[in-house]
């Protein structure tokens, strides 16, 4: 079986797992810089999979390392945000937010659940690639000064230093199975701008 077939097979295998993770995270949202339980939960999932990780990076951030053959050869990072927004959920679904006035309205539950699934796939395939994949679970994306800058000050981009970082954001107008990308910065946030 070639690597593409193995990836597809593992993606099918972990699809129910990723849905389960997304629904759990959706049901238990936490605001920016308050992601205590979210961080613990994500760490427990990494631990259960046997994936090396470190908690408390820049507050509630987590960094996981999936080391392939020759782990120092090259390093690539994947990043997902994990905070929610101060919005009351109106959806009527079995996994509706249990935290009044807080919900995952921006897809960060999907981002974190997807990265958990990807980390497991990469862990299963670690004998097939060279280098290290650094999985970054970022707190505080929705609030200034932003969890990324705090994680950077706490050394997230060192030991090992990634040559590149990839992030994702769900985008409902794209059909399932499609990926949109462009060069340069592209992510948005709910920052406010005051013109005086």
Regions found by a protein language model. Give the residues of each.
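Acidic/His- and Gly-rich active-site-bordering loop/insert found
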Residues: 3-104, 113-129
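Histidine/acidic-residue-rich, glycine-tolerant segments that coordinate divalent metal ions
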Residues: 85-87, 92-103, 110, 127-196
